[in-house]
Amino acid sequence: MIVTPVSEVEGEFFKTWSPSMKSTSSNSCNSKNHIDTRDINSFYPSPVEDSEAFIPNNQPYSFLLVDDNEINLRIFRRMLLKLFPNASVRTVQESASVEISHRTLSHYHLIFLDIEMPIVTGTEIASKVRSSRELDQVGLIAVTTKYLCADLELYEKLGFDFTFRKPVEYPTNYILQKIEQVLQTRCGGRV
């Protein structure tokens, strides 16, 4: 394993990297991982610092981020505001404080949920959201380290529209494209 300092949005973190940890570019369980060990940064481009040109989506969407880790919330919020500069992004660190009702969640276009949280998990929140017909237009995206085939199948059964693997270090255009696909599917792009 190689330990490399990686500059992140909120400061200097250390990332442990091995070829078996390579992110795949799809939610497919059958993806083949081809590793070229010449450039570690090509495997883990920072979504906030990559040099890839993209056009931000200027629609005033409303997003809810639920994660028990404050640093994850800050990083993901900053990334979303880079991709959607006119969006409203609310963060919640206490999963138990998320009231799941039409009145409280219907104004969100998309909810990003960490899966492993104390008290109330992301899968429990997703199950409750999807059990309410009134919240069908709200998109759900899992953001998690649990990314095995069985996990992805469970998230799909629970009604998640997509899953990002943590750390979220995909190319910016890929993240933007996947979020826009969920927005189009769930709410028809409505603002």
Curated annotation (Swiss-Prot):
This is Stress response regulator protein 1. The gene is SRR1. The keyword Metal-binding does not apply. Gene3D superfamilies: 3.40.50.2300. PROSITE patterns: RESPONSE_REGULATORY. Residues 62-181 form the Response regulatory domain. The modification 4-aspartylphosphate is found at D114. Pfam families: Response_reg. Keywords: Phosphoprotein. Required for stress adaptation, morphogenesis and virulence. CDD domains: REC_hyHK_CKI1_RcsC-like. GO terms for biological process: filamentous growth of a population of unicellular organisms in response to biotic stimulus; phosphorelay signal transduction system; positive regulation of filamentous growth of a population of unicellular organisms in response to biotic stimulus.
